[in-house]
Amino acid sequence: MDQTQHPSKAAQPLRSEKTRHCDGFRIFLAALSFSYICKALGGVIMKSSITQIERRFDIPSSISGLIDGGFEIGNLLVIVFVSYFGSKLHRPKLIGTGCFIMGIGSILTALPHFFMGYYRYATENDISSLHNSTLTCLVNQTTSLTGTSPEIMEKGCEKGSNSYTWIYVLMGNMLRGIGETPIVPLGVSYIDDFAKEGNSSMYLGTLHTIAMIGPILGFIMSSVFAKLYVDVGYVDLRSVRITPQDARWVGAWWLGFIVNGLLCIICSIPFFFLPKIPKRSQKERKNSASLHVLKTDEDKNPVTNPTTQEKQAPANLTGFLWSLRSILTNEQYVIFLILTLLQISSFIGSFTYLFKFIEQQFGQTASQANFLLGVITIPTMASGMFLGGYLIKRLKLTLLGITKFVFFTTTMAYVFYLSYFLLICENKAFAGLTLTYDGMNPVDSHIDVPLSYCNSDCICDKNQWEPVCGENGVTYISPCLAGCKSFRGDKKLMNIEFYDCSCVSGSGFQKGNHSARLGECPRDKCKTKYYFYITFQVIISFFTALGSTSLMLILIRSVQPELKSLGMGFHSLVVRTLGGILAPVYYGALIDRTCMKWSVTSCGARGACRLYNSRLFGMIYVGLSIALKTPILLLYVALIYVMKRKMKRNDNKILENGRKFTDEGNPEPVNNNGYSCVPSDEKNSETPL
C-alpha cells in the first residue's frame, strides 16, 4: 500500500509493545468507570462528614455549607477552559490530570488532622483531674466558677490557635471540584466520538450503572469510620469517655478522604498511557484518510485566508450574543431552567444536612445513618433510574409524554415528602434548655434559664457541657447543674455514675439518693417514627430516580440543535452557582438559628452547636425543602402548557404547508414522521416536539 496514503504507518514500528497494549478503547472505558466510582465516592464522603467536620473545627453549619459548596466553586473556575479547549487537547491525559488533582484535593482535605493536635471534647479544667474540676456540685465555695477561668482560657487558646484550619478543607474541596471538571464532559465526548455506531448509549448507561458503586462504598466506609474515634492510633481509646451517641463525638472523618485520595491518584495512571485517538480498525482508518483527502487547503491552513480570520472574532461575538438571547427568550428553556434550579437546590441543601437531621430528630448515630442510607436508599435509586429508562423506551413516550411522566413522579415524591411533617419529634427533655432545672416545667425560652432551688447553692460553670442522664429520663447539661454531690467510677473516667443529685430527686420522685450517669438520655419515643422515615425515604428516592433519567433529554430538546451546547453550559452554570454553592449556605444559616446550646472554643468564641431545638430544626429543614418543591409542580404545569401550545403551532404549520403543496399538485405534503418535507421559513424555529 502506498506510504503517502498512510504516513503514520512509518512511525508505527517505533511504538513499544507496552504502548500497543494500552492503545485500546476498552481500557479507556475501564479507567473512566474507575474515575466515576472515585468521584462519586468522594462526594458521598464529604456529605457524610459534614457534621464531624463541624464538631472537629468548631464551626457553625453556615461555614460547613460553604465548605461543601467549595466543590462547585472549583468546578466553575475551570469549566469554561475545559469546555473550550478540552476537545482540542489530549482528552485522556486531561482526564488523568483531573483525577490526580482530585486525589491531591482529597488528601489536602484530610491534612489538618495531622497538625491540629489531639481533639479535646472537654475544656482543660474538665479533663485535668476529676477531683479538682467543676463536674460535681460545689456547695459553700468562695471561688466563682460561672465561667472558664482566664488562665485556663488563655492556655487553651494558645494551644488551639487553629481557628481557621477549616480553610484547608475548603481548599481541598475546591481542588476536588477542579479535578472533577474534565471527567464527565471529556469522557462522554470521547465515548461518543470513538464508540462504534449505536453503542454510545449502551456504554454511557453501563458507565452510570457502575458509578453507583461509589455512593454505596462511600456510605459503608463513612459508617465504619464514624465509629472510630478521630484520634484513633494516637490516644488510648480506653481514656475516651464519650461514645458515638454523644453530641461531641467526632469520628475518623479524615480516613475516608485519605482512602479516596489514594484511589483517585491510582485511577489517574492509566489515562497517561492512552493515545489521543484510540486504535481503530483498518476500515475506519481508510474512511478517516478518505475524509482527510477531501479537506480543502483552506480548511487545513486557515492562515491563507486572512480575510476570514479578520472577520471571525466579531462574527463569533455577535453569534454568541444572538445565541444567548435566543435561549433566554425561549420560554420553554427558561421554565425548565428555573424548575431544575429549584430541584437541585432542594436536593443539595437537604442532602448536605440529611445526616444531621437524622441525628437530631431520631437520635441515630452518624454510623447508623450512613449504613442505612447506603444499603437501602442507593439500590432503590439505581432500580428507579433503570425502571424509568425502561418505561420511557417501552411506552415510546414523546417529549410531551416524558414531561408528563416526570411531573407524575415529582408529584408522588412531593406527596410523600409532606408526610415528614408528621414525623418531626418533640424536643428532648433537657433541663436548663427545654425544661426548668428541676425537670418539672417547660420553659418559654432556652436563653438564661434561671437556676432552681435544687442547684442554686451549687457553683457551676454554665459553659461546661458534660451531659448526664438522670433516673427520671431528663438530661442535664452537667452533673453540677443536676445538683449531684458525689460520684463513683474508675480512673479512666469511664462508666462514671453520680449520686445525691438533688434536681433528679425533685422531678416527681421521692426524696432520696437519686443518681445520674454520663451521657444523654436515649430518645426511645422516636424509634417508631424513624422506621416510618426510612420507609418514606425509600419511596421518595424511588420516585425521584424514576423521573430523573429524562431531565437531560427535556433540556437538550428545549433548544435548537445548534444551541444545544450553549444551552447545556448555561444551565450548568446557573444550577451550580445558585444551587450547588448557595443552597448549602442558606440551609446551614437557617439551621444555625435553631441551635439552643453552642460550644465555647478555647478562646471563648462560639463554636459548633451542641443541641438543636429538634422541633424547630425539623420544621425549618422540611419546610424549606417544601417551599422549594411547591413551585416546581406549578412550573411543570406551565411547561406542559407551553409544549402543547408549541405542538399546536407546529401542527398548524404542517397543515399550511400541506395546503400549499396540494395547490401545487403534490398529494402527499407530509412525510411519514408527520413533519413537513420543506424546511420552515422561520430561522428561529425550535426543534419539533
From Swiss-Prot:
Tissue expression summary: Liver specific.
Keywords: Cell membrane, Disulfide bond, Glycoprotein, Ion transport, Membrane, Phosphoprotein, Transmembrane, Transmembrane helix, Transport
Membrane topology, from the record: Multi-pass membrane protein
Known catalytic reactions: estrone 3-sulfate(out) = estrone 3-sulfate(in); taurocholate(out) = taurocholate(in); prostaglandin E2(out) = prostaglandin E2(in); L-thyroxine(out) = L-thyroxine(in)
Disulfide bonds: C454-C484, C460-C480, C469-C503
Region (Disordered): 658-689
Positions of post-translational Phosphoserine modification: S288, S290, S680
Transmembrane segments: 27-46, 66-86, 93-117, 164-192, 212-232, 251-275, 327-348, 369-392, 397-420, 534-556, 566-591, 626-643
Extracellular side: 47-65, 118-163, 233-250, 349-368, 421-533, 592-625
GO BP, one annotated term: response to glucocorticoid
Cellular-component GO terms for this entry: basolateral plasma membrane; plasma membrane
Biased composition (Basic and acidic residues): 680-689
Cytoplasmic topological intervals: 1-26, 87-92, 193-211, 276-326, 393-396, 557-565, 644-689
Taxonomy, superkingdom: Eukaryota
Any GO MF annotation of the entry: organic anion transmembrane transporter activity
Keyword Glycoprotein on entry: yes
UniProt modified residues of type Phosphothreonine: T662
Pfam family, one: Kazal_2
Chief location of this protein within or outside the cell: membrane
Glycosylated position list: N132, N140, N513
Gene3D superfamilies xref list: 3.30.60.30, MFS general substrate transporter like domains
UniProt record similarity statement: Belongs to the organo anion transporter (TC 2.A.60) family.
Annotated function: Mediates the Na(+)-independent uptake of organic anions such as taurochlate, bromosulfophthalein and steroid conjugates (estrone 3-sulfate, 17-beta-glucuronosyl estradiol, dehydroepiandrosterone sulfate). Also transports prostaglandin E2 and L-thyroxine (T4). Shows a pH-sensitive substrate specificity which may be ascribed to the protonation state of the binding site and leads to a stimulation of substrate transport in an acidic microenvironment. Hydrogencarbonate/HCO3(-) acts as the probable counteranion that exchanges for organic anions.
UniProt-recorded name of the protein: Solute carrier organic anion transporter family member 1B2
Species assigned in the record: Mus musculus (Mouse)
Lineage per the UniProt record: Eukaryota, Metazoa, Chordata, Craniata, Vertebrata
Name of encoding gene: Slco1b2
